[in-house]
Swiss-Prot record:
Site residues by UniProt (Transition state stabilizer): 300
Any one GO MF annotation of this record: calcium ion binding
One Gene Ontology CC term in the entry: extracellular region
GO biological process: carbohydrate metabolic process
SUPFAM superfamilies cross-referenced by the UniProt entry: (Trans)glycosidases (SSF51445), Glycosyl hydrolase domain (SSF51011)
Main localization category: cytoplasm
Entry keyword Cytoplasm: yes
Inducing factors: Circadian-regulated, with a peak in expression at the beginning of the light period.
Listed name of the protein: Probable alpha-amylase 2
Location of the active site: 193, 218
Cofactor(s) needed: Ca(2+)
Amino acid sequence: MGYYNNVFDECNDQTDIGRVIRDGREVILQAYNWESHKYDWWRNLDGKVPDIAKSGFTSAWLPPPSQSLAPEGYLPQDLYSLNSAYGSEHLLKSLLRKMKQYKVRAMADIVINHRVGTTRGHGGMYNRYDGISLPWDEHAVTSCTGGLGNRSTGDNFNGVPNVDHTQHFVRKDIIGWLRWLRNTVGFQDFRFDFARGYSANYVKEYIGAAKPLFSVGECWDSCNYNGHGLDYNQDSHRQRIISWIDATGQISAAFDFTTKGILQEAVKGQYWRLCDAQGKPPGVMGWWPSRAVTFLDNHDTGSTQAHWPFPSHHVMEGYAYILTHPGIPCVFYDHFYDWGSSIHDQIVKLIDIRRRQDIHSRSTVRVLKAESNLYAAIVGEKICMKLGDGSWCPSGRDWTLATSGHRYAVWHK
């Protein structure tokens, strides 16, 4: 089993950067997709804030706020310019004020692995940042991506200058920008994009300096496959994510790509995958649930990019799993707002059950059945749930059906 220590969880005298993780009652909405920049997005979300709050979401993950060479926001250039394809700085700040009014935290997508230059420098590459805020020169760019800085401390993001986080002046400027987002603009949470691209030690430094209430990193690499498909044992995959979390000083969560990879195969009649060799959930959720942000799809895996989509006919089975289980569930905008009122309302019902039964990120899981066409578990000793078309219901008169849908059912005591 993967190793971690839970000193951080047990400390009650941490600063507020630990409070949200210790509480463990988060439900996140990813509030955009890959096409959102084509619409008046900040204004669109402004109109949805009351529903987001009423539905039980504690935080909404917003797209990258800064000016970017690509409209989606993932090729940032002038970090301090908040006029983007999603809308103006004025509309963004208005949205953030409304979210605060409705007690929904705003999560900023922090894209600091790479930055597009404005002028040509060393080697004729666009690796200088003249004429904009944070006017770095080539020493801010890693040597492996055309700069005069040091080698990268992580994986390269090809095609654009990668930021050299070993440089003190770079880290100082990034911290200043993060503090500005946190204290002046109005974001409370951070999501670190392409977190494999630089050492988790720097994530630890940035969180410690800017003090977001909650942070999550994107550590996405391939699951373990063999000639016949997905391996049953994904321990090495989840251990890589666990190791990244540990290297942040345990103060950041991470997206549970292991659970996503397993769950989207399990719903195809392979529910035996949802129980590991120790009888626990097989993803990061099974080893370190308080740091595991579970999800079905995001703007990369789903939406119009569809790099690794969850099977569309099984989406509600997926949400019945992550919304009743430990970890920190994250719901995708498309599923919640674009796939019809039935799915929207079923998700809201599951969130409501989670709240009423006080299921949280550390709730216990007792797997009762994990067969080809049936998965059943008791979570927190408060709810019981099943997935699949196998016939099953909990024994005992204590259980009352709370909700059900296509290939899922949930009971409570």
